[in-house]
Amino acid sequence: MDPIRFGLSRVPFAHCYNKRVIFRANYLVPLTWLKNNVAYKSTNTLLLPTPNAEYYSTSKLSSQVNVSLNSLSQKASSGSKIYPFKNSFPLPFSRSILPIRSLAFLKLCVRHNSTVPSKDEQAQDISKINTNGTLQTPNKKVNVFRLFTLARGQGWNFFIAGSLLLVSSGVTMSIPYIVGKILDAGSSGDSSVTHIMGIPSGTFYIGLLGLFFLGSACNFGRIITLRLLSERIVSRLRARLFAKCMSLDGAFFDFHKHGDLISRLTTDSSIVGKSLSMYLSDGLRSSVSAIAGIGMMLYVSMRLTGYMSLIVPPIALGAFFYGEYVRKLSRTTQDALGDLTRVSEEKLANVRTTQAFLGERQEVNRYNDYIRNLFVLAKREAFASGIFFGSTGFLGNATVIAILALGGRMVAAGDITVGQLSSFLLYTVYAGGSIVGLSGCFTDIMKGLGAASRLFELLDAKPKIAPTVGIPVPVTVGKAILSFRNVGFAYPTRPSASIFDNLSFDIHPGTNVAIVAPSGGGKSTISQLLLRFYAPSSGKILADGVDISTYNVHQWRSHFGLVGQEPVLFSGTIGENIAYGKSNASQEEIEDAAKRANCSFVLSFPEKWSTQVGTRGLQLSGGQKQRIAIARALLRNPAFLILDEATSALDGEAEVMVDKTIQSLMHNRSMTTITIAHKLATIRRADQIIVVGDGKVLEQGSFERLSRPGTNFYKLMRWQLGKVEP
């Protein structure tokens, strides 16, 4: 933005070589490289000619940029407004002519984002994703039998748990019958009961105590077995899901947010594991108890059982509809929980940006909206559960009252004894409780099916780029000519916004090729296509005439080293991050790669190579993270080295030192270097420059040829250097 137009004071943080920013400053405040105090404060006109000034000494580090800059700017016609690429939006910078104070700090360089589509384009793309997305699988109903496939190989554990369940349930269901016999013996009129069921009373009660101990022991064993079985299933399921995620291509992660995938790996897998163990066990126990209870009720009195059976159809029908409702609601709830996890992960990861723009209240309100949605779903389930279980409880209690009334008449008529009526009532309570429990287990299993549908979506996802399928990559691939032939590409989430259209060029082995394009022109997309994170929509990418899509992806990527513009580090030590690309690397190799990438700062840390970098490397500066990323790439000694604006996060001094390392690598003709950059100092060292714009190659050639007036490269460099006002 133009600070003059909006009446703002601008405080840019810039590298010393970024004179397009520095020349517009009214005041310069250079910071020393070794200290955090201000070295000088003056206007740029006073600092530039002073050899002892900090700005002068640091600006000399990029003198090679100035040579090319001056050679271009001297040939330019003043006042011309040239910007050669459509669909790109240059920012309206202008030289300050009004007395507005601004400061330039020589530290940080700001990169502008790419073209943003219109709202209509975004809506059109989203509608296509929802209807035609190749990775958006429909919400299929998962049957119980497929759910059991997740527990494959656990048959022996299920057999043990089932056997223990039968024994413990048998002991439990014998209690009403035994109680009835004790009551009949006590109501016989004999003052001293010596035998119960033909067994001496003392022996009977000791045996009864032993029976209860057996039931408790079996119940203990069942719970332990099923808990371990549940954790085993969940652990194996999570490992399988995570391995599946690691095998999917970039298009999948464009469609599915990380927070939703984390929710599937954690919450959904836990629900499914419990459904296959604890809930299934409870359901089996309720089934056994209900069947045994009804059988004993028939044995005691078929007449009372006939009256009792009138309650079964409405309860069974209600349980079926309730279970189906909960299954669908569970799927919706798990989706909402996945959205909540996604938002939490995204907002917490960018909390500093939120705080910098005072967006705390906005983000809290947005998070509360997701919580409110989840609460509404939980409230719907609560009302449904209350209606179902309240109704079944009322019907059960009403049935008990009816049984008492009818049973009392039958006792008075002498059709049954008091003990038999007591046993029947206890069996009624047991059977009724088991039926209600069975309904609850059915509900929990339906929840498991809802969660399982999300897991099977992930397990059934088929990437367009299979990681382990394809022919072996020849060992001589490092000397191959890489060719783009009429390549067309659009990101899967935005199929209507074409990035490339008939893109064609060659990269010869052992050369240093620079890819140049305006912001949003597809520079980084070329590296993603080369690494096969995505597949071209049309055309082919060849290696010595062989389509790289026929190669094994893992083997193909093993020949590449990548240094991205945004360094990515993992939690762990510095040494572990450098050795990430080569797990068997020795300490010597790690230190050598770090030395070549100018990671001398590691030796200043107390723990040196064992220093923890923190989550995503937050304990290191941007430049330190970038140099570790460079060392990680160099450790592999790749045949193809992709530098995607690899020095963008470094300060001037560190960049020059790393550039020397990269420059020495470029002289190594056994390695092909593909540089994606916008800095003139990096571009001018390339053997070949490929200028990309409007989805195709506009021109290619050497720096000397393309830097002539009239070329697209010349116009782009003039705009980047601030010599042309857009």
Curated annotation (Swiss-Prot):
It is a multi-pass membrane protein. Residues 158-447 form the ABC transmembrane type-1 domain. Keywords: ATP-binding, Glycoprotein, Membrane, Mitochondrion, Mitochondrion inner membrane, Nucleotide-binding, Transit peptide, Transmembrane, Transmembrane helix, Transport. GO terms for cellular component: membrane; mitochondrial inner membrane; mitochondrion. The chain crosses the membrane at residues 158-178, 196-216, 306-326, 386-406, 423-443. Residues 1-112 form a transit peptide. PROSITE patterns: ABC_TM1F, ABC_TRANSPORTER_1, ABC_TRANSPORTER_2. Disulfide bonds: none annotated. The keyword Mitochondrion applies. Its main location: mitochondrion. ATP binds at A517, P518, S519, G520, G521, G522, K523, S524. Belongs to the ABC transporter superfamily. ABCB family. Mitochondrial peptide exporter (TC 3.A.1.212) subfamily. Mediates export of peptides generated upon proteolysis of mitochondrial inner membrane proteins. This is ATP-dependent permease MDL1, mitochondrial. The lineage of its organism: Eukaryota, Fungi, Dikarya, Ascomycota, Taphrinomycotina.
